[in-house]
A protein has these predicted regions:
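Short, flexible active-site-proximal loops enriched in glycine and acidic residues
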Residues: 93-101
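Glycine-rich, positively charged N-terminal anion/phosphate-binding segment
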Residues: 1-5, 19-94
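Extreme N-terminal starter segment of soluble prokaryotic enzymes
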Residues: 1-2, 10-14
Length: 101
């Protein structure tokens, strides 16, 4: 069985990638109902999070029925990525994915 940290997945897991304007809570709910084993929120701008942008903050909404669920943050500034990772950690996702580049 594949394992990511303490998350144990089935042999052939069904994963939902972080997709902008697609993997929002209603879509994730549908995916979970249809067998998704691990899901990600939409990817979130690190700059948007540290500037308290409403659109970025809304993407932090995760719900217990979605677990395990991850959040991906993206950006190119080391300081912004560090600050935004602390914001993300506060909502307690099961995974944090870093897209730095």
């Amino acid at each position: 069985m594949p394992k990511i940290g303490n998350i144990i997945l089935p042999d052939f897991p069904l994963l939902l990638a972080p997709m902008e304007d697609v993997s929002d809570p209603p879509f994730r709910r549908l995916c979970k109902l249809h067998g998704a084993d691990l899901m990600y929120s939409e990817f979130i701008s690190s700059e948007g999070l540290i500037r308290d942008a409403m659109k970025s903050k809304q993407k932090l909404d995760i719900f217990d029925y979605e677990r395990p669920v991850g959040i991906q943050i993206f950006g190119g500034d080391e300081e912004a990525m560090e600050m935004s990772s602390r914001i993300v950690d506060a909502v307690q996702p099961d995974l944090v994915d870093i897209n730095f580049g």
